């Protein structure tokens, strides 16, 4: 494999869909949100993306079979006659600068093929969120930005970089004449963060005007918060032990003259 390829297993019958992208990143916010959407909407997989820019290993199943790392496209036909969706997530982001650009370009070409006019990218925004994580937004156009702000998002601070596919798609979308908006959930970043993903989905469902049952994330949020509390206690214990060791060492200091 010399370059990124997209293989379709079936044709998706969609009417000017919105494409939602959520690859692994800070706090896995994008992947958690997109996977939850796929499950809630019962979206159907219709294409896969393979790339030599993904990490060089295969995944092994419980039965011992293997598969390459990949990205997956899912389609959802809105029975209410409103916005159809293409949802894209995957096992990894590209591990090279060239790969990030190449995969973003392939995604945009694929979006163009299905007459996508708007793309929503989802990711994490590193921040110590105390209570409810905020959603930070950046967009290629004022209308999309205003829609997100009305839905509860806050405009990204000037100069803040959006790293990876979530950001590059925004930057490259204008060359394909596609509008794009990025929703970033505040997250500590070092653990999977379903709470940040839920905040993003609350904004997204308002923008898309679809009803989602987000209570399924509450159990995952509780598990994540228990893990954070456990790690904080471990860190506090480590610091306390370090202080005690330092005190003991100070007592043992002798001066030789």
State what each model feature region is:
Residues 23-29, 94, 124-128, 163, ...:
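Gly/Ser/Thr-rich loops at beta-strand to alpha-helix junctions
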Residues 28-32, 98-102, 164, 168, ...:
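Conserved active-site and cofactor/substrate-binding residues in soluble primary-metabolism enzymes
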Residues 106-119, 175-179, 207-212:
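Secondary-structure boundary elements
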Residues 128-207:
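Catalytic cores of processing enzymes, dominated by hydrolases/peptidases
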């Amino acid at each position: 494999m010399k370059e990124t390829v997209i293989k379709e297993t079936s044709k998706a019958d969609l009417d000017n869909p919105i494409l939602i992208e959520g690859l692994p990143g800070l706090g896995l916010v994008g992947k958690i949100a997109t996977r939850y959407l796929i499950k809630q909407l019962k979206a159907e997989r219709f294409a896969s993306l393979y790339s030599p820019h993904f990490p060089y290993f295969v995944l092994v199943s419980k039965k011992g079979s293997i598969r390459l790392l990949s990205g997956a496209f899912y389609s959802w036909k809105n029975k209410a006659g409103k916005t159809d969706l293409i949802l894209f997530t995957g096992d990894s982001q590209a591990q090279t600068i060239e790969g990030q650009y190449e995969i973003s370009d392939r995604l945009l070409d694929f979006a163009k093929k299905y007459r996508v006019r708007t793309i929503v990218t989802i990711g994490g925004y590193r921040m110590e969120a105390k209570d409810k994580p905020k959603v930070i937004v950046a967009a290629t156009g004022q209308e999309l930005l205003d829609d997100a702000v009305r839905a509860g998002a806050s405009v990204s601070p000037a100069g803040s970089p959006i790293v990876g596919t979530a950001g590059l798609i925004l930057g490259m979308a204008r060359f394909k004449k596609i509008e794009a908006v990025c929703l970033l959930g505040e997250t500590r970043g070092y653990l999977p963060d379903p709470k940040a993903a839920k905040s993003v989905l609350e904004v997204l469902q308002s923008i898309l005007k679809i009803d989602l049952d987000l209570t399924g994330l509450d159990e995952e949020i509780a598990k994540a918060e228990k893990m954070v509390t456990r790690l904080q206690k471990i860190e506090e214990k480590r610091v306390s032990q370090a202080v005690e060791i330092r005190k003991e060492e100070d007592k043992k200091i002798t001066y030789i003259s």
